[in-house]
Amino acid sequence: MNCRRHAPRWTVRDQIAHLWCFDHRALLSLTDPAAFADDARWLAANGGAEASVALGRAMSPGELLDVWRQGRAHLLTAAADLDPSARVPWYGPSMSARSCLTARLMETWAHGQDVADALGAIRVPTDRLRHVAHIGVRARPFSYAVRRLEMPAGEVHVALRSPSGGAWMWDDPSNGDGTGAAADSVTGSALDFCLVVTQRRHLADTDLVVRGPLAEEWMSIAQAFAGPPGEGRAPGQFTGR
């Protein structure tokens, strides 16, 4: 569990500890907003993401896996009776409980990819990737805001092929005047799209087809996860899925 992942700094142990830490923070957000606010201030003053892995480094692999799985079970139990539209605090603006839990799914999938890459494992994608893809599409404004860039006007049509072979689409596929396809679009497999928006693969190492300047710029900075701008992956760093 101490083997290094290909992304900077963290081991597989650190990945699991990070997921455990923020599953617990999500539980606080859903059940005790005041405690969440206190903890958020502590986390910001003590290293942020790096503080999230410190406890895990002091545990054995078995202990860490146990507390992570127990914590995830507690989170699922707390979420079962929630109004999906209820607002809950997070780091930055509040969000709906549904969005909070979808973000946890996205984070687990993304860090799970780091673990798979470190171990040389291949995961089989499922249609649950739609949740990750949806966050990636809706996070387009955030991808600009986190870099203090102004998002250009205009929509980008996203058309993805699901793992089961279905079609997933976001935003108007026309160019707005009824004369043809959207000027800016991203098409390809849902897996490739999710790998790019979570910054687990460089765009050049996928089969996504990116058309138009708005789409090209977005895909160069796409970021589905919260926090400062991610470092992403270098071209050629990964070629497998």
What do these predicted ranges mean?
Residues N2-F22, S52-L64, P89-E107, R128-V132:
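Alpha-helical scaffold segments that form or flank carboxylate-/histidine-based iron centers
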Residues T31-W42, D81-R241:
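Structured surface interface patches that mediate subunit assembly and partner/cofactor docking
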Residues D23-H24, R201:
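Residue-level detector of secondary-structure transition/capping positions
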